[in-house]
Amino acid sequence: VWREGYAPPLAYPWQEEAVEALRGRSGVLAAPTGSGKTWVAYRWAHLLDASGMPGHPRERVIFTAPIKALSNERYLDLRKMGLDVGIETGDFKKNADAPVLCCTQEIYTLKYAGRRNIRLVVDEFHYIFTDPPRARTYMDGLRLTDPEVPLLMMSATFGEASRVKLYLERVLQRPFVLFESEARITELVFSKEPVSHPADIRNALVFLFSRQGVEEMAEQTALCRERLPREKIDRIRSIGSILGVKKVPHPLLSGVGLYHGSLLPREKLLVETAFRERLLDVVVGTDALALGVNLPAEYVIFAQLASYHDDAPISKNHFLQMAGRAGRKGLYEKGYVTWFDRSPWENRFYDTGEIYAGLLKKPSEPAAIELSPSYGRLLREECTLEAEARMVAQYSLPERDYWEVVREIRSVLRKVGSLSKRLVKPHLRKKYRDILGEVWFDEMELEQNMKIARLFCLQGMPHALSAVRLLEPHERNRLQALLRIKRLANALPRGYGFKGMSVLEKEIHSVDATVFTFEERLREIEESRSF
């Protein structure tokens, strides 16, 4: 039975067509952001029947996502439907034996790949096109998946989707159906007129690519506005209090949220919740906003289109993914996309308006999947250098040059050798290299892995907070270092572990309790609305 207050969504013609095309088969579903792909996935997995009522899945259903926030969101959505659903990420799990499970791709690859009698939905599959280390995790998990397990890959639109279908068929040795749609539930309008002043920004998500830019633009936009009415400010502070946010950022009191990777989870939840309650009407953020987080807005405004990281304009695919956040059925029947004129936050030597005009004319780029070598497997001697290079070359899209991959692997292994000489004494190097292979964690860079391996080599069972101190300089904040060590601890092989994990968990709870209690806090926020 549906939970009280939950109404089954209505289907659109393209969704019914997709369900028919994908019925009983593995498939790739490519459709724009905000088009309603999730409804198709629920039907495909038998979580909904044709009338939109709860279905009866014949197998366990697993949903994977590239980031924890999306697993949390999918879990909460399925809970609202009244389903028995669990969640498992590297640092949190709840009801993980449930018939429906939401997890990160890393957890699927580590724990669930190879199991039978499941249906697998891979959400935001396009994420792997721009992240080689994560692409390897995705493809390792998919290659380990039992051939009888049905797969549904959900993705935003991209160029030459048929190449991805053929790639998956070649790598996974099974047939796939490709269903592409350009349909959107709401109309998307690309404006020819820019926004010229922060005072003109309303009902919008504003994109930039740096924390400093986000903070500056949020402040400037807030300064152009009156403070919110007292009752709205009180409500924002009440939400913040429930989430444990002691000081509400000044821009929120004028209806402007800010969103970037250095925020604590509770700070992100405050912005997301206040925006969905329409207490805020603007969120200024990095492209973290584009990763499926549910923030319905009428406008998407680009205040930057050339990233500092690449020192180049963003891709058409990335542009469309962010633009697709505009519009939401039932709130904004049309979504509008534009740019901020003469943006002072644009990468120097670039003009936002010129890039915007060029992106509108540019075709979508073909999907590219570049796999990274598995140095853990190489160090454990589970494969030869040649076999690993051949796998990486053949299973990338387009295929990489074999000798180029060989040179890349040899270069990294030489670096391992030279760094080992600096990190440990000669009599420990064989032991150290063995440990490095055994505790290697794909989430971490080479030097981070080597420092952690040294800790195990010298201390046997090191204290978790000692490992946190090693990683902290590489992370945006201490919480991220704490959570990474928690995920590493969960992934360590038998015979390895950290002392003081209870101390680490206690510190995580003191820094941000919503890591473990997000569902309870959100329920409390919802209940507090009725008073």
Provide a role label for each language-model segment:
Residues 27, 92, 143, 150-152, ...:
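Conserved interdomain linker/interface between the two RecA-like ATPase lobes of SF2 helicase motors
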Residues 148-150, 295, 299-355:
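Conserved segment of the helicase C-terminal RecA-like domain
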Residues 105-152:
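SF2 helicase catalytic motif II
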